[in-house]
Amino acid sequence: MQYLILSLIFLIPSLGMLTGLSIAATVLFFLLIIVITELISFIRKQEFSKKFLIKLYPRFGFDDIFCVKNRIKTELLFIAWCFISCLFTIHPINSLVTFTKVFALLFLRFVNNVVTFQNILYLKNSLILGIITAILLFFIEYSSHGFLTRMFKTHFGLYMLDRGCALLSITTWVVIIILFSNGKNINAFILYIVVLYLLSISDSLASFVGFSIGGIIFILARLIKKIFFKLITISLITGSLLFPIIAKQIDPHNLSEKYLATKPSAAHRLFIWHFVANKIIIKPILGYGFASSKYIKTSDNEMIDYRGEKLHPLPLHPHNNILQITLELGILGLALFLCLVYKYLKEIDNIKISNFRAASYSCFINYYIIGMISYNIWQTWWILSGIWILVLMKLLVKPDIIIDN
């Protein structure tokens, strides 16, 4: 079973580069294997009934259940509001199904808090090899116009590697932390430059922007560490609160013609954001309900006429996590979401080792920015990508932090 986990840690980033859609399946399988491994271990020790429940949250026992509740009360409030919003959404049944799926995945992450493994060095090496393989596979596909992809698909477009690039950009930060922990600072810098170049020639603008800003965040977190938490918190929360207002005020036609004439996909984003901002004004407090974006009706006169082409103003989701939260859950949901953002930034700031803290900030911002530009916040593969990073941090990074502290 440990060999299987070792193989998956290698395969998820490398296989994910070629077939981004497989990320959801492979990461979910990875999490289930970890849980099964731990269950088998407890059963063999005949300690399953009590210790499994205790180790769901390692620092607390049965007598401290209320402490656990208080520790995750912000998460519980957010989950409760998401559930309540399912009751008044456009399609309650569909929203409840999505709600169940999303928070079942998040609970699976919670259960994975119990996991500990021996031979961590092998797991680290497997992840590093997986990242190197993913990089090589990208350049093979890029230079050969999808030689490997066309073996099992009829055509190839560079956009097919977008999900793999997104996964690579956030997973690379875990490897950078590992390299720093081993004193290989130059190797960490080289890896960052190589991945940055890869993303710059890819079709994934969101990943490139997120990874680039992540690098800037790393430097700032090291240089001004005393005030960095306040700076990043104020910037992130203020920017998130202002974004719906900015999206309402922009002129997408004018901006698209001036700056995005050669990037139709990015231009379409501006129209989507402007449309969503106008929809938010109609139901600003409560929103339209959990996972309701793709069910919001649009009339013919709301269709976008851009360069003689008709574009949909809201195709499935807003392509921006802040706008999606505000649209679906209202200002109440956005406030709870930003409380979670503050909480997780504070937890990162509590890390004592400077390089670990800086790289963790970078990874968080990288993930946050990609979500601000591209993906549906409730998308299974994107949620699992975040869980994948958290589990890697727990398995491969946290033991080093504890030892160093």
UniProtKB/Swiss-Prot annotation:
Localization per record: Membrane
Superkingdom as given in the UniProt entry: Bacteria
Record-annotated membrane-spanning stretches: 23-43, 77-97, 120-140, 156-178, 201-221, 227-247, 270-290, 322-342, 353-375, 377-397
Family annotation (Pfam families): Wzy_C
Membrane topology term: Multi-pass membrane protein
Keywords in alphabetical order: Membrane, Transmembrane, Transmembrane helix
Gene Ontology, cellular component aspect: membrane
Similarity comment: family membership: Belongs to the O-antigen ligase family.
Protein name: Putative polysaccharide ligase RT0347
Organism expressing this protein natively: Rickettsia typhi (strain ATCC VR-144 / Wilmington)
